[in-house]
Structure formats: C-alpha cells, structure tokens
Amino acid sequence: MSASSLLIIISSPPYAGTDRVWNALRLAETAVSSGTATRVFLINDGVDTGRPAAAPPDVEYNLCAILTELVDKGVSVRYCKTCIDRCGVGAGEMAPPLEVGSMKGLHQWIIESDRVVTF
C-alpha cells in the first residue's frame, strides 16, 4: 500500500434505519478519489452490505451497488468467510467482485494500514 492508506471495517447491518454503512461507503469514495489507497472489510452484520438480495426494493441507496462501484475504482473489498458461514449465507450470494477474507487477512490489512476506521 502507499504511504497514505485507509482501512474501513464495516460491522453494522445495512438498511437498519441508520446511514452508518452509507457513510462508510461515502468515506471510501472520498478517500479513493483523493488518491488514498483504500480497503473495505465486511464483518459481522456488515457482510450483508455485499449481498445484492439484501437491498429492500424501495431503498434510496443500493449499498451493494455502491460497493461494487468502489471495487471498479480500485478499492479492495473482502468479507469475513466465518461470518458468512455463521449467517448461513452462501458465497454465491455475494456480489462477484468481492473477495473472501479471513481474520488473518484482516489482521494483515490492519498492520499495513495507516488509518483504520470502524462503522
């Protein structure tokens, strides 16, 4: 990673009546647009952010679509495999550009990042 790097950990559920996850993705967009090497890790209830089917039909912001756009802009996005297994969600239900992650991988990302923010 470059001298300026940011890791955003999303553990909050999307579409839970708050803008927490949406703001996390807005921060990622701002960071990557500013030239900051940016990574996002989905953990706990945050893994649902990467599931296209999790978006309610009448939602104002499709968070999974925003996440996919961030990948297209160079943001690395991984999700916790253990959280997927615990929730009973199959990997096939995750958006294709997202990568399977692990606690070991998250630990490595934390070590490599200049800043870590959790939502």
Q: For the regions a protein language model found, what residue spans apply to each?
A:
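Hydrophobic anchor at the start of a short beta-strand
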Residues: L6, T38, V77
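Anion (oxyanion) recognition and catalysis
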Residues: V32, V71, I110-I111
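Short, active-site-adjacent cap segments at secondary-structure transitions
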Residues: V47-G50, R86-C87
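Short glycine-enriched, charge-decorated loop/helix-capping segments at active-site entrances
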Residues: A53-D58, M94-P96
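A glycine-rich helix N-cap at a beta->alpha junction
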Residues: P56-D85
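C-terminal structural segments of small proteins and small subunits
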Residues: R86-T118
